[in-house]
Amino acid sequence: MFNPRHPGGEFFGRKHHRRHAPDGRSSSSSSSSSECELGYDERRCCRQEPDAHCCDREHRKFWKHPPEFPHFGKCKGRHALPFPRMEHWPGPKHCPFLSEKDMKDLPVTVHHGCMPIVAHGVVMFHIVSETKPSITISNTGAIKVEANGIQLLSASLKEKYPVDKVVASYANKIATIRIPCDAAFSESPVDIPITIQK
């Protein structure tokens, strides 16, 4: 029998995927949400290279993306075939749901309600509501979502964030609010006079 645990600490084979990665909340390393600024693919994997990583949505932990090539183990008999390598990596924070600590790098601050999901450079709030809620945004950037007299979300946009970039929709009893991340850093175009020399 071969030892399923690699000397480097990785685990191999499907039967070992039940092992949970250690909780990353005790990690002292701080990480911003820009760690995956290129967004996630359909597997909830970060597109950013070279340190791509996946997210285990069930346990809300980051997992290291498996390499493109298989790992060949020093095994005999039926174990001689290459088997995929998956490195367990707890990551610096839960994902894709963000904590208040991670919110400081986003264009919105949550005061009451659910934390957003960040994907493809967009901050998204998914709010469950039996009826169509009312969504208001003041000129100061305060966001309020209410339904049947109950406040579902209270948030505020960061200073100088363009309010017109916020988009909201309601379908299947879920209100979705989308806030692009990069809009906070883009300034409005300013006309520059052109001098034509003769």
Swiss-Prot record:
Region (Disordered): 1-36
Superkingdom of the source species: Eukaryota
InterPro entries: DUF5450
Remaining remarks: This protein is found only in group 3 isolates.
UniProt-recorded name of the protein: Protein C4
Protein source organism: Giardia intestinalis (Giardia lamblia)
